[in-house]
């Protein structure tokens, strides 16, 4: 069963970041992120498949998510990822959340992530997350 393609509104309103059937990527800065977005479009991804975020846009939300994490979440992989993402955001990283409902889409994302030296690429499954690079 494939999860639905998320919007920025979905992400903003979600209490936790768990975008099933999506890949979260961070790049050195907003300019590199923009170049990676163009490269993904060139491989066949549609505009609605790609949610791009600037560091300025992502940092406050990540700070809030880390701050609001419950004590139990502090020991899970979810909070480890949030802290990693926050660290990258505070260093000026640009972000993407890309809809990837199948392995072929994921491979195209990984190829672009490697070409643009992504800091991270994490695929979200229903019950687990997968570091892709």
Role assignments for model-derived ranges:
Residues 1-133:
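Positively charged, small/polar-rich N-terminal and surface patches that mediate targeting and assembly
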